[in-house]
Amino acid sequence: MDKTNTRSSFPLVPIRSLGPRHRERIAKHLLALDGSDRYLRFGYAASDEQINRYAEGLNFERDDIYGIFNRKLELIAMAHVAVGDEPEQAKHAEFGVSVLKAARGRGFGARLFDRAVMHARNEGRDTLFIHALSENTAMLKIARNAGATVERSGSESDAYLKLPAATLATRLTEMVEDQMAEVDYGFKQQAKHFQELVSSIQGD
């Protein structure tokens, strides 16, 4: 049984690949996290300045970054899949995720993990790695449910998920989901612009 697929547990959610033009929204999303959430996400209580530096330093050419937007085009959940610079690190990727409090309980973290697994497989990577605080039980539960091996060392834990090779199904699924996310984002943009137009007319 392929435990790297968690799709049966959660509904399909449009997940969009993020690029440099989303940098400001990424920063806004992370700045909305409170102190405890920042601690769990980064492993330390990141300040606003540190978060802004993190967002500015994102390498969209090397890494994969995904987001889930609500109807207002607010980034309510995002994942960062980081790849090392060295050639020997090309087969491995590290996963990090954050979900705003108001959007929790809907399986967004697991869906983002599932999306990251699929893309990593399609890119020929064989291991997805998670480094988390041991108290970050939600993140570690997602990893365990996907079949990852979790090793605890005091206040920190590492999870390793071995990935099977890509298949025609994973490649086609990723292509379809990318297209669906683009269409969904376009609809939300149009709806937002229409609402802004109506509001401006009513305000005149």
Predicted segments, located by residue:
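Terminal substrate-recognition subdomain of acyl/acetyltransferases
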Residues: M1-L12, R121, H131-A132, T137-D204
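A short beta-loop-alpha structural element at the N-terminal edge
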Residues: V13-R25
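Helix-loop element at the rim of GNAT/NAT acetyltransferase active sites that forms part
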Residues: P20, K28-Y44
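Acetyl-CoA-dependent GNAT
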Residues: G43-K91, L100
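A short, internal acetyl-CoA/4′-phosphopantetheine-binding micro-motif in the GNAT/acyltransferase core
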Residues: F69, G96-G105, L133
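Basic nucleic-acid-binding interfaces
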Residues: V81, F113, A148
